[in-house]
Regions:
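Charged docking surfaces used in two-component/phosphorelay signaling
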Residues: 187-364
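N-terminal Rossmann-like NAD(P) cofactor-binding subdomain of oxidoreductases
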Residues: 2-206, 240, 323-327, 349-364
Length: 364
């Protein structure tokens, strides 16, 4: 068996960083060797740095407890023994943009869960099941950065994961106007009910920045690589998306209710067929975290439900249900995705697996 690729986590003490830690335990391709966080955590063991703030459902893995946390600002020290890093740092966006480029320029690929570089034109915003061809833009990005190995790749916002896969499956029917309302779990804010008690029995009808991301990010996901410009050009067809994003008292799982018009006139049978028979390069390549079936279609009127369906395909699959004709729009449906697995650390990990399979992430 070939030697595993060594990986570090930037922002290892936050909720997404903790999720990366749990996902990387016994990973078949990657070995977690470095943890980095703020100066406040640097120099402590990971267990000391976390203190009582471990937020995962499973206990902290033994292999990380005594790892000494490095200062994320000490770039040269952090990259010493790693082949690439996951970024889940909690900083102002301008600082994230700067530090992620600093890491990339050390010839260390950065796979980021952050939004800071999502609209950098030559940074791919990948969903392995939908747009793996976007990773081709990395060669253009490397020229800009002056690197031969280093680059930045990002994943899209957690809010779009519950409906964008359906739009991708229905691409041939030309989605036009889409109205989406998302009902988003508190873990998306890095919280649990223990540290956000006011969310118990409550709904907050505003999540800063989420509506813009929910409307615009699918357009980059559905865009194309312009080889002349060396960048990703967002989809410029007739697709328009408007959204409302609401925080609800659920721990994990973002639900979306969606109304949609098409340029063509698909039947329900055609729509369901495209969902359940959706295939992708991710499953063909056998990526460790790629779901066997990306999208499941549920026929019961009361599905998808968070309690029953959020962990579909280990939290990496997407559940669609309640597909029916609408009196104003053409069709409507409900989608569900796990926001910290498919929508955050799990999606970033699968992206790294795709980048490794395509030869962009290698041992240094």
């Amino acid at each position: 068996m070939s030697e595993k690729i060594k990986v570090g986590i930037l922002g290892a003490t936050g909720m997404v960083g903790q999720r990366f830690v749990t996902l990387l335990e016994n990973h078949p391709w990657f070995e977690l060797v470095t943890l980095a966080a703020s100066a406040h955590s640097a120099g402590k063991t990971y267990e000391e740095a976390i203190g009582g703030r471990w937020k995962m459902e499973t206990p902290m893995p033994e292999f990380v407890k005594n790892m000494v946390v490095k200062n994320v600002a000490d770039v040269e020290d952090v990259v010493k023994n790693v082949d690439f890093v996951f970024s889940a740092v909690n900083m102002p966006k301008a600082e994230i943009r700067t530090i992620e480029e600093e890491y990339a320029k050390t010839e260390t690929p950065v796979v980021s869960n952050n939004s800071a570089h999502r609209w950098t034109p030559d940074v791919p915003m990948g969903v392995p099941e939908i747009n793996p061809e976007h990773y081709e833009v990395i060669e253009h990005q490397r020229k800009r950065l002056g690197t031969t190995h280093g680059f930045i790749a990002v994943k899209p916002n957690c809010s779009i994961q519950a409906y964008t896969p359906a739009l991708a499956a229905w691409k041939e029917f030309e989605p036009r106007e889409v109205i989406v309302s998302t009902y988003q779990a508190i873990s998306g804010a890095g919280k649990t009910f223990n540290d956000w008690p006011e969310m118990v029995g409550n709904i907050i009808p505003f999540i800063s920045g989420e509506e813009e991301k929910s409307e615009k990010e699918p357009l980059k996901v559905f865009g194309r690589v312009d080889e002349e410009k060396g960048e990703i050009v967002p989809f410029d067809g007739p697709l328009k998306i408007t959204s409302q994003c609401i925080r609800v008292p659920v721990l994990n799982g973002h639900t979306a209710t969606v109304f949609i018009n098409f340029g063509k006139n698909p039947t329900k049978e055609e729509l369901v067929d495209r969902l359940v028979n959706y295939t992708s390069k991710a499953s063909e390549l056998g990526l460790p975290h790629a779901p066997k079936q990306f999208i499941q279609y549920l026929t019961d009127d009361d599905r998808p439900q968070v309690k029953k369906d959020v962990d579909y395909e280990g939290g990496m699959g997407v559940s669609i249900g309640r597909l029916r004709e609408d009196s104003i729009f053409d069709w409507k449906f409900v989608g569900l995705a796990h926001n910290t697995l498919r929508g955050a650390a799990g999606g970033a990990l699968e992206s790294a697996e795709m980048l490794k399979a395509l030869g962009y992430i290698t041992k240094k």
